[in-house]
Amino acid sequence: MANIERRVIAEGEEFCVECAVRTDLTSPVSEFLDGIEGGAADHVGDLEPDEQIRWYDWFMAACDGLAEYGTLPHRHDHNQLLDGIWEIKHSVLRITFFDTDGSGEYEPLIDSDSYSRFTTRPWPDDFLYYLRLTTAFTKTAPKAPPAEIELAKTVRTEDLEHDRSP
């Protein structure tokens, strides 16, 4: 497998936010963003087209700030889910991501056990430069659906494989 080009959402002093790519060269987040940009996504609950477009605009601006300054607009705009999978959240929509150095290696910065002991939401200052967006979903329950977390981990595994190949 050869290195591939990823859709870059934002690149700045702190991070490069880009879409992860699966083994079959699809990108779930890229496809999701294309849908909500035009208000045409069909798996976003009851969000009307204009709400989808507003969410897209918020997300793109949030990624610009994240890439340049290393932070999201508000401290409640993210969560760590499990095993190094994080989410950017706004309203009911979620986009999962992980960090990497771009070499195909991966090690979670904070595990779920240590995360549960924090009294505030941690934002690791030592995230690696590449933040790869993996999946998108609508959150309708108090916790992220386990199947969504597993899918994000699968996309991460497949995406990192591209980095390991010459």
Predicted feature descriptions by range:
Residues M1-V92, D101-L131, F137-P166:
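Basic, Lys/Arg-enriched alpha-helical interface segments
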